[in-house]
């Protein structure tokens, strides 16, 4: 039994609108609810977030995550990664090729000349096995077969969503393989702290802080150049809070290459793998805030630079730059960059990462 069976959901989503069978597996809607009645709604198709209901500074609840209100629209979304889980490899791998243990692997090309977010049918397009443990915890499991989307090894993946009484959405990722492989899991949440609407307001007035002294520059097809650059004196310096819109259209090579921000920031860490502060945004009209904490070495800032005007939950529309993504992850194209933190997973090892999105308000 899920929370959708017990009480009226403040998110307004209906369980039956998410129930169908895809490739022989059942999809459903799961509601996590904390002591204050705030909610997170998730479908097991792609592990997609379809509602995050949190209050503004006046206590008014609104949905701050972009998504869809039925399974057909989730499956057929013009933005296939709209607030979904991403794997096996989040972000880009140059030309869809990499070498591992002396063997070259070829992945589907689905983003210009590159492979993006695990290929043509990544974890965003899979039906996960779901078990709701209690009011606040959902466990998702997926077994990625050997050779799926060109990757080596069978990969057994578990993702646990927890919504705490402190309005923290905690995402724990775990995975094991039976053969050496590469892995880079993340969540592609499109956040709209003003609340989704028709149209959903621009993110350009969000005040943003990112705990990073360095970022990874990209070429014209969004592959890392190989450098790691200091943010000082560039549009990528968010060490002191500034609005997203201040430099999003700056006359800067890197902004042009990303059509805005679509870059990985190298997070400041005292030690590898520590859970630490990554980023914070504040929406000035509603007073809503979101802080990001992660064990990952990087966070991809994406400012919704391409898709424009498609429809979401309850008649909402999502113009270009109405959502913002903080994708906690290892760096893009790491399998081809031995000097980047390793993304190799060996048999007998366990991949683990934790990311927290903490929602709050300021007066």
Locations of the language-model features?
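An exposed, glycine/acidic-rich loop-and-rim segment of catalytic or binding clefts
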Residues: 2-363
């Amino acid at each position: 039994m899920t929370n959708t069976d017990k009480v009226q959901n403040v998110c307004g989503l209906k369980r039956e609108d998410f129930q169908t069978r895809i490739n022989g597996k059942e999809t459903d809607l799961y509601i996590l609810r904390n002591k204050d009645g705030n909610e997170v709604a998730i479908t097991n198709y792609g592990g997609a977030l379809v509602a995050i209901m949190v209050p503004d500074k006046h206590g008014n609840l609104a949905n701050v995550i972009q998504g869809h209100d039925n399974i057909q629209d989730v499956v057929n979304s013009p933005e296939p990664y709209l607030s979904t889980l991403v794997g096996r490899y989040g972000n880009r791998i140059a030309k869809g090729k990499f070498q591992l243990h002396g063997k070259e692997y070829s992945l589907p090309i689905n983003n210009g000349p590159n492979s993006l977010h695990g290929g043509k049918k990544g974890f965003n397009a899979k039906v996960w096995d779901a078990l709701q443990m209690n009011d606040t915890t959902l466990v998702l499991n997926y077994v990625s077969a050997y050779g799926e989307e060109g990757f080596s090894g069978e990969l057994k993946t578990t993702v646990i969503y927890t919504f705490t009484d402190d309005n923290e959405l905690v995402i724990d990722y775990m995975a094991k393989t039976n053969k050496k492989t590469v892995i880079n899991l993340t969540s592609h949440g499109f956040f709209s702290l003003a609340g989704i609407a028709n149209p959903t307001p621009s993110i350009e007035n969000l005040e943003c802080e990112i705990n990073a002294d360095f970022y990874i520059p990209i070429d014209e097809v969004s592959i890392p150049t190989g450098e790691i650059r200091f943010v000082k004196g560039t549009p990528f310096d968010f060490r002191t809070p500034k609005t997203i819109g201040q430099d999003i259209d700056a006359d800067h090579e890197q902004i042009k290459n990303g059509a805005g921000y679509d870059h990985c920031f190298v997070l400041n860490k005292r030690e590898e793998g520590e859970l630490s502060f990554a980023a914070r945004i504040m929406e000035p009209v509603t007073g809503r805030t979101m802080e990001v904490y992660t064990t990952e070495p990087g966070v991809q800032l994406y400012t919704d630079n391409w898709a424009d005007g498609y429809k979401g939950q309850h008649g909402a529309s999502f113009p270009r730059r109405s959502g913002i993504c903080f994708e906690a992850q290892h760096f893009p194209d790491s399998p081809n960059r031995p000097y980047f933190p390793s993304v190799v997973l060996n048999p007998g090892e366990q991949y683990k990462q934790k990311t927290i999105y903490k929602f709050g308000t300021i007066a």
